[in-house]
């Protein structure tokens, strides 16, 4: 499902709690939802964000914000999982520990979501994703 909001305040989705807004805010809960969007006719630039832990807005964002609500963890085999981009690292770390998978425990309490791992370094205490 896609949710589209115009002129949405962003204070609740950035860790600095900056009271700014964006022209268009789109949340989705399936990756296939994105192919249904008309990217030619939405305000530019387009930014894809997670929990906003690495964002500092200094003013209103004149473009479109995409935000994943894909919040699932699926066990595919003993050591293979499918994890939604919107799953928080703390939740994933707790899940992995319950499953007996070692190594992700140092990711607990890291602000951010799993989807960020594709584009930035995420780690603490000598453990990196």
Task: Identify the function of each model-found stretch.
Residues 2-129:
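Anion-binding (especially nucleotide phosphate/pyrophosphate-binding) glycine-rich loop
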């Amino acid at each position: 499902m896609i949710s589209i909001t115009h002129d949405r305040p962003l204070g609740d989705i950035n860790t600095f709690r900056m009271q700014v807004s964006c022209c268009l805010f789109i949340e989705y809960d399936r990756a296939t939802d994105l192919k249904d969007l008309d990217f030619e006719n939405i305000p530019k630039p387009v930014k894809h964000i997670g929990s906003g832990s690495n964002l500092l807005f200094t003013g209103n964002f004149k473009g479109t914000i995409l935000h994943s609500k894909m919040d699932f963890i699926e066990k595919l085999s003993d050591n293979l999982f499918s994890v939604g981009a919107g799953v928080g690292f703390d939740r994933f770390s707790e899940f992995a520990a319950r499953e007996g998978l070692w190594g992700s425990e140092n990711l607990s309490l890291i602000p951010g979501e799993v989807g960020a791992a594709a584009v930035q370094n995420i780690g603490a205490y000598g453990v990196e994703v």
